[in-house]
Curated annotation (Swiss-Prot):
Intramembrane parts of the chain: 87-107
Family stated for the protein in its record: Belongs to the caveolin family.
Topology of this chain in the membrane: Peripheral membrane protein
Native organism: Eulemur macaco macaco
Protein name: Caveolin-2
Length: 162
């Protein structure tokens, strides 16, 4: 439990087909990502996700655990992240993709067949409504406001200091 002077390296060996190559890739830099094969996030929707060990667990310089503990925790972190992600995607990815597909199909159908025809109908009717509203304003509201304004403009107040 003393001060460790030697640095130890951690290496995980996984099959190329079964593990994502994006573990330490900065998604904001496309040049680093170009050689990693098929890009599953071409629009960088999840570039904010940082799930590297150093981004989650860090020890300050004044308090370090033993190198073996650090190495084992790093290895367990990477393995558990890998296994849990695979486990969750096996059980959740297909049902959630199905639900998202139904949701987006429903929203698209509503937008195409209900919302846009309603908006277009309103835009077709608005010029005639605008003409009617202008006539009502000119005939009723404008004279009323003018007479009220003239009546109230003749009122004067005088304050006296008694």
């Amino acid at each position: 439990m003393g001060l460790e002077t030697e640095k130890a390296d951690v290496q995980l060996f996984l099959d190329d087909d079964s593990y994502s190559h994006h573990g330490d890739v900065d998604y904001a830099d496309p040049e680093k990502f170009a050689d990693s094969g098929h890009d599953r996030d071409p629009h960088r929707l999840n570039s904010h996700l940082k799930v590297g060990f150093e981004d989650v667990i860090a020890e300050p310089m004044t308090t370090h655990s033993c190198d073996k503990v650090w190495i084992c925790s790093h290895a367990l972190f990477e393995i558990s992240k890998y296994v849990m992600y695979k486990f969750l995607t096996v059980f959740l990815a297909i049902p959630l993709a199905f639900a998202a597909g139904i949701l987006f199909a429903t929203l698209s159908c509503l937008h195409i067949w209900i919302i846009m025809p309603f908006v277009k109908t309103c835009l077709m009717v608005l010029p005639s409504v605008q003409t009617i509203w202008k006539s009502v304003t000119d005939v009723i509201i404008a004279p009323l406001c003018t007479s009220v304004g003239r009546s109230l403009s003749s009122i004067s107040l005088q304050l006296s200091h008694d």
